[in-house]
A protein has these predicted regions:
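Bacterial N-terminal signal peptides that target proteins for export
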Residues: 2-13
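Classical Sec-dependent N-terminal signal peptides that target proteins to the secretory pathway
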Residues: 15-19
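C-terminal motif of bacterial Sec signal peptides marking the signal peptidase cleavage site
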Residues: 21-25
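Predominantly soluble domains enriched in secretory-pathway, periplasmic, or organellar proteins
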Residues: 26-463
Length: 463
């Protein structure tokens, strides 16, 4: 058969189109992980909690709801969740509500949270969650939840220890922390059954309660704000002012406990409370072996001469980087503090990408309704030679929804997601591995939730 020039060109065009279509259609789209988000059913506190779940698309990062979700969180006002034991179990901390029926809990009495609990879920291969059992902490107003790296122990930070209802200089707070201490927070420790995921209480082997029995919790200084595990040390960020609302902020100092991964025991370190020289600490994070404390108060950066990592000026917040020394003593990185970006406010969460090259700080902003221009994500490049140092990514800050509560990276290290409290959304961005930029996605990048989110986490197990 003979072809004219036009026929040949037409045939080649059809063939090329077929090849292109074939290649395009062979690009496999699959779920690379699951994104779970705790929150409330409606955009107000005090309502029943839920867990929403999404499948993360490997190619473009879009989110698709997991069949059967959302499900009840097992209580009111869920604030934290963790996965453990190979992502077979998920635990959700529900704060409960006060006598007024909302989640603004503090102290003891009518303002303290009632019916707080930890609800356990089994995680199915398709991401579905099935409720198992419910457990309870020893103190009041629980608000933080972590699991150790072995997956054998789970810890809950209670803002108020049981003895706070009747303060005394001879109570269990004083027995653990020293004479004259009348109030304290506490950590409740549970051992996780590796088969069933059931939690069992770990009692304090170091301190005997005033009634002669084993103490069922581990006291920490009053007004805790956050806590974090780093190796064999548990660090608790505490504040000076007694809070009159939630969330708890005003962190000023860090308290170390030595931690045993074989028994779950917390023992008093040789170091005492370490002041940080700040007054509005919001969070303490362990990322790639560095301890970061986020502080929501202005800092002035000066640049005497030469090249400085940050432009001189006054910034609305700061991040303090530390390494951990003997007994949990914090040692400041030689580079010193680094500022939050100038246009944002209220740093609340921090993420270091899986390659350890870039650091991102989610800023909640200061407006709870309407336009919130101070919400967004600050971005930094991490340098380790000749010494640890951070510098702003040129294209930062990056957009988010209004009032981000959490920031996570997907299991394939391609996408970053934030759950946003004030507009009840999830936002996603594509992570550029060469520049650290968080770019807009090729398709949808905002998903609407049923109500206000409080926390998010990613599961990389999809089978």
């Amino acid at each position: 058969m003979r072809f004219t020039k036009f026929g040949k060109a037409l045939s080649m065009g059809v063939l090329s189109a077929g090849i292109i279509f074939g290649i395009t259609s062979c690009v496999e789209s699959y779920t690379v992980g699951f994104l779970y988000i705790t929150g409330t059913v409606t955009a107000s506190s005090g309502t029943s909690g839920i867990i929403s779940g999404y499948r993360i698309d490997h190619n473009v990062g879009t989110l698709a709801p997991i069949d059967g979700l959302p499900v009840s969180s097992g209580g009111a006002n869920p604030v934290r969740a963790v996965l453990t034991l190979g992502s077979r179990f998920l635990y959700v901390l529900n704060r409960g509500v006060n006598n007024a029926g909302n989640g603004d809990c503090f102290g003891v009495g009518s303002a303290e949270c009632q019916n707080a609990n930890i609800t356990q879920y089994a995680v199915g291969g398709n991401g579905i969650l099935t409720a198992q059992e419910t457990f309870f902490t020893q103190g009041q107003n629980p608000f933080r939840l972590i699991v150790d790296s072995s997956g054998n122990y789970l810890m809950v930070l209670d803002h108020d220890a049981p003895d706070n209802a009747n303060p005394s200089s001879n109570d269990n707070c004083a027995r653990a922390l020293g004479a004259g201490i009348t109030t304290c927070g506490d950590v409740t420790v549970f051992q996780i059954n590796s088969t069933t995921g059931r939690l069992s209480l770990v009692v304090n082997a170091q301190v005997t309660a005033a009634n002669g029995s084993a103490l069922t919790y581990f006291p920490v200084p009053a007004n805790p704000v956050d806590f974090v595990l780093t190796g064999g040390i548990l660090l608790t960020l505490t504040g000076a002012p007694t809070p009159t609302s939630y969330p708890y902020t005003g962190g000023t100092s860090v308290w170390p406990y030595s931690y045993s991964s074989s028994s779950g025991q917390l023992t008093l370190s040789q170091n005492s409370v370490q002041p940080l020289g700040i007054h509005q600490g919001t969070n303490i994070v362990n990322a790639s072996g560095v301890i970061y404390v986020l502080d929501n108060e202005p800092v002035t950066i000066t640049c005497a001469s030469g090249t400085c990592p940050f432009p001189a000026g006054t910034y609305p917040g700061q991040i303090l980087p530390f390494t951990t020394g003997t007994g949990g003593a914090l040692q400041a990185e030689p580079s010193g503090i680094f500022p939050d970006t100038a246009s944002l406010a209220n740093p609340i969460q921090l993420l270091v990408d899986s390659k350890g090259k870039y650091l991102y700080v989610a800023n909640q902003g200061n407006n709870t309704t309407g336009n919130n221009p101070e919400s967004g994500t600050a971005g930094y490049e991490i340098f380790t030679a000749p010494s640890y140092e951070l510098q702003f990514i040129p294209e930062q800050p990056f957009g988010s929804g209004s009032g981000p509560q959490c920031i996570v990276e997907d299991p394939s290290s391609q996408f970053v997601y934030e759950a946003n409290e004030y507009d009840s959304t999830v936002t996603g961005r594509t992570l550029d591995p060469n520049t650290g930029d968080l770019n807009t996605m090729r398709s949808t990048e905002t998903w609407t939730l049923q109500g206000q989110p409080t926390w998010c986490l990613v599961d990389g197990r999809t089978s």
